[in-house]
């Protein structure tokens, strides 16, 4: 793991594309494609400092994972009966999760059709950081790059590629992305009172949904 060397040039667009490639394919500078990750890229960076921190954190991985799991279960128990809030659930047979994110679905119809963005802003105003999670990544531009690449255009007729584009539709995935609200893993490492604060804030927003509309 790691990166080294340098790339220099006088073509701004090319240099921006090089930067994007080394940083997960994310947009930068003159990159004007839709989505957060318009091209295929990588991320191989690691410093000695990061390695030292990582090694020390390994000692806590079991206890932190246990703590996040317990707090996630408690949070679910607190918010599962709030109308319009649908906590995530683990598949049958799954004994624990890492909880990189704790997601739940926000059904705006139960909140007087208050948009998700407004709900999240109100939640942040209560001191609870949150985000909308990931968008529909199949629309970020990576697939289109593959479809227009030399390998694909040589291997498949245009009609087949156009058909694939037409069939590229995942409404259930899109709905999940539209409804998702997420907490980052660090929120699950605090004491029980922190989890109560999160649940109480969501309950407060529901009770005052008329004022949010």
Task: Specify the residue positions occupied by each region the protein language model found.
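Glycine-rich phosphate-binding loop of ATP-grasp-fold ATP-dependent ligases
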Residues: 2-7
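PLP-dependent aminotransferase class I/II
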Residues: 10-213
